[in-house]
């Protein structure tokens, strides 16, 4: 079976912003995403969004070009204003046409 290398971008964001982020991922070129409820604590042990729904973990498998667009969007429109975590992992996928 042929496998292709792609990037898995994982973003943990306040639930109130999840739909906006999901839309931005699509605009950036992501073909899909998975969103799940998440909870935890960051380096400051602060949870600003407990009242309005907690956090959501949004993940998408993308190519390098789409990843760059997503990271630029996060850096410009999210990181300066919101409590958000983001990391990128190298993954291998089957059915590459889906990503």
Residue ranges and their predicted role:
Residues 1-99:
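Positively charged, small/polar-rich N-terminal and surface patches that mediate targeting and assembly
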């Amino acid at each position: 079976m042929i496998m292709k290398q792609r990037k898995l971008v994982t973003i943990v964001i306040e639930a109130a912003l999840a739909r906006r982020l999901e839309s931005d991922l699509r605009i950036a070129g992501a073909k899909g995403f998975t969103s799940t409820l998440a909870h935890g604590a960051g380096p400051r042990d602060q949870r600003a969004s407990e009242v309005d729904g907690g956090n959501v973990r949004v993940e998408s498998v993308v190519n390098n070009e789409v990843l760059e667009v997503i990271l630029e969007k996060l850096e410009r429109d999210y990181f300066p204003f919101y409590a958000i975590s983001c990391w990128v992992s190298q993954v291998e996928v089957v059915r590459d046409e889906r990503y």
